[in-house]
Amino acid sequence: MKIIMLGAPGAGKGTQAKQIADKYTIPHISTGDIFRANIKNGTELGKKAKAYMDQGALVPDELTCDLVMDRIAQDDCKNGFVLDGFPRTIPQAEALTAALNKIGQSMDYAIDVDVPDENIVNRMSVRRACLNCGATYHIVSIPTKVEGICDRCGSETVLRDDDKPETVQKRLSVYHEQTQPLIDYYKEQGILKSVDGTQPMDKVFADITAILEA
């Protein structure tokens, strides 16, 4: 079961991807997590990625594609995987399709978590992220047990630069220009499914599960 999660930044696709991965015992492959690990470790890739992410811009294809392809080739992906944050552009999608075709495979589903822009801005302004492990929280619906401290590792949680309202607006503009065309791309391939991302998270997940098990 090979799944791509689509949707604007802050639509909740990462949360849903993790739940899918847990339920079906397949890896959750998040480019965001990979980038944050590189940023934390101060790698050259991390420094380059951070410069783009802090501006609300997309990390260029060449910094992303090979990394994801190598991850997909690992043994734990042989029964499937959930891609979260990749592909983000038509060239990335075409590269992924070509790479999978070479090994006689293709994606099974592209699931679009659909949320209006206004909801996204409001939602992300109350999001907090752990500086150490990348865990995300919502100060209303998913607060930390101790304010400002990550439940998972005990490190500080902050409003990330790329979650600030002015950056979110820019990220949404970039999304509509570069990433939303993927909706049409996967619709043409016949694998696009859409769910209403404004619903409670458990209802969104129930809708996704119904699609995967139909």
Predicted regions located by residue number:
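Glycine-rich phosphate-binding loop of ATP-dependent small-molecule kinases
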Residues: 1-214
